Design a protein with these regions (language model features):
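Short, hydrophobic/aromatic beta-strand segments
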Residues: 49-51, 156-163
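Beta-strand/loop-rich accessory regions of lumenal/periplasmic or secreted enzymes
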Residues: 70-99, 178-192, 199-200
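Hydrophobic small-molecule pocket/channel-lining residues, especially in calycin-type beta-barrels
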Residues: 54-57, 61, 127-134, 156, ...
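Residues that act as N-cap/strand-start positions at coil-to-secondary-structure junctions
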Residues: 23-25, 34, 44, 97-102, ...
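Extended, loop-rich substrate-binding clefts of extracytoplasmic carbohydrate-active enzymes
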Residues: 92-144
Length: 213
């Protein structure tokens, strides 16, 4: 699927390294930079791919995913906002609505190291029907040798959020994650609390843990 995105015809050339393309009628911003190749769907401000120069693709994207308006894209980095997981109110979508809304490309900047893209989502009639708050939400992607994502919300409310990343992993037994703290809730083991002995999370078996920080 990622190769298909980069083979799409250019609808609008925004800069020498930035273009707008379409898949199934949905707009995708494609970064084709000497230092990095990446793509972001305007539906959900959803990072679909990120490949630094000389490296393998960092993200996984399902070949069967839908890009139709309002559909949740399977893979990449979904933005879960203004809540993560099931809603406390029955009938509302899991993981909020930001990932199913149409965002706008608000700003972009490119230099020798890569590109920075900023997308914006504002409250509208559809979001207010689900969540009665006015807001402006920005998603900022710094794409180069590394990938950094920032969410910036403006308004008066309380939220939870997540960047629900699908990594492209070769050998899961070789993967280790640090910096999450020592304490976790083990959802595989009836939500029992546990502690990492060295602060490093490995994946020898099925793992579904929530870090407590």
């Amino acid at each position: 699927m990622i190769n298909k995105i980069f083979a799409l015809p250019v609808v609008e050339q925004l800069t020498p390294v930035l273009s707008r393309r379409q898949i199934d009628g949905a707009d995708v911003i494609v970064v084709d930079h000497p230092r990095v190749k990446a793509s972001v769907a305007l539906n959900g401000a959803h990072l679909l791919s990120w490949k630094p120069e000389g490296e393998v693709e960092g993200l996984w994207l399902s070949d069967a995913t839908s890009f139709k308006k309002g559909a949740a894209i399977r893979g990449g980095v979904p933005i879960c906002w203004p809540w993560f997981g099931p809603s406390a109110q029955p009938g509302l979508p899991s993981h909020g609505f930001a990932r199913n809304q149409q965002w706008t490309l608000k700003a972009h900047n490119e230099d020798d190291s890569g590109a920075v893209l900023t997308f914006e989502l504002q409250a509208n009639d559809e979001t207010r029907a689900l969540w009665p708050h006015d807001f402006t939400l920005y998603a900022r992607f710094k794409l180069g040798k590394t990938c950094e994502i920032e969410l910036e919300a403006h308004g008066e409310f309380e939220t939870t959020s997540a960047l629900h990343t699908y990594f492209n992993v070769g050998d899961i037994s070789a993967v280790k994650v640090s910096g999450l703290g020592d304490t976790f809730i083990d959802k595989v083991d009836n939500a029992k609390e546990g502690k990492l002995s060295d602060g490093v999370q490995a994946f020898p078996d099925r793992t579904d843990r929530k870090s407590v920080v």
